[in-house]
Amino acid sequence: MKLGVCTWTFGPISLENTFERVSRLGFDGVELHGDLESFTPEYVLGLCQKHNLQVFSLTPGDCDPASPDASDREAADKYYRDLIDFAHAIGGARVSLHGLVGRIRPSAGSDHATEYGYLVEFLRPICAYAAERQVPLVFEVLNRYESHLINTGEQCRQLIKDVGSDQLKVLLDAYHMNIEEADPVKALAQTGQQLGLYHVADSNRGGIGQGHSALQPQFEQLAKMGYPGPIIIEAPAMGPDPFTPVKEGDYLTKLEHQLSLSVTALREQFAPATAI
């Protein structure tokens, strides 16, 4: 099982420094934050070669594909097309989509059904474009404290059905499932082959074993259903505000400690069986 980590959790250090740390910690690759103004595909490919890493996926910056404001949706359309082009240029990494983080209710004068309709209409041409560029898409299921649109695996599977494209799959995250799913293992099982990516963090958004989430049954379910990977750890340094990577003190040492524990736990969990 290949393991990755979200680059945004390393904060404002350079991408090269981030890749150095990721490689040293024993990861196979990264989920790259989609800040397209900060680096080129050629630069990223060079870092991958230098540090023997892959870019498994791209996570989007701030945009609102379900906004009642057409100009917001147009900006999101351009951004995601650029992100898909970037993913194509580096070899076809998955592109993650989700609603605008922090918008936890419909905009004034709007409602959930209307904005859901905007999202479906937005995704159809984006999926078609991604298919042309041979770039897989995953829609990340966020908890209700981050987004009002898609909060459960069931809702995401319905979204994919309404969009009508096999190019789009589900991204389930253990941290969000701990909040929204009555049974995360069941959510994984019901998603089945529609699972395109899996994120993990414990209940407190720390590393594996730092909270109270029952992660072991989820890992067993992933193995049972033949999920090929990767597993992406999205666990910033512990402290106030889980959306901000930089915490008081030496946040990078704190971050690397919990990532190291998580890598060890996952390597042990998914180690190949030894023949007797």
Each language-model region and where it sits:
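Histidine-acidic metal/acid-base catalytic patches
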Residues: 1-2, 9-23, 38, 91-93, ...
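Active-site-proximal loop/turn and secondary-structure-junction residues that shape catalytic pockets
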Residues: 9-11, 34-36, 60-64, 99-103, ...
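N-terminal substrate-binding region of glycoside hydrolase catalytic domains
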Residues: 21-37, 59-62
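Residue-level detector of anion-binding/catalytic polar loops
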Residues: 28-29, 54, 93, 136, ...
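Conserved beta-strand positions in the central sheet of alpha/beta enzyme cores
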Residues: 31, 57, 96, 138, ...
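Active-site-adjacent beta->alpha loops and helix N-cap segments on the catalytic face
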Residues: 37-47
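The substrate-binding groove and active-site-proximal loops of carbohydrate-active enzymes
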Residues: 64-74, 113, 204-209
